[in-house]
Amino acid sequence: MEEADKTRTYLVLDEENIYNENENFRILAYFSLSTKSIQIARKVAKSKVREFDGINKNAENIDCYLIGQLGKNEIYKDIINGKIILDSAIDIIETIKSFIGRRVILVESVDDEKVIQFYINNGFTKIEEIEIITKDDKIEKLHQLIRRI
């Protein structure tokens, strides 16, 4: 996806100790940023749709920034937490927003209540459940959550 210019992946490094004992970078976490247009469910209030779209309360699609593959290196899990990683992603999105606009951040969470609750606790609202077909032809449920920026 990176080579096709569909996304950008960011690494979070340990600024106090950039290299590990093998002289490799100490990668604490990573996340990917992209964009995506999502269809807004009819059950979303018109006032919310206008807030997300910026103009149209009847908008059917909203262009979003997509935070994907947010994760941390388990080796350094005591050094960094999910909120720091998420805040790093949002900081970059806010910079991009100043150049090209848009109002909404989207995450598509795995079907795990702890992960979903993490996003809700960080200002996201669950709007939809979708199903995708994985590379090995299995159906996987994802939860779409959005946050206004």
Give the residues covered by each predicted segment.
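Non-catalytic substrate-recognition and accessory regions of acyl/acetyltransferase enzymes
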Residues: 1-77, 84, 88-106, 110-149
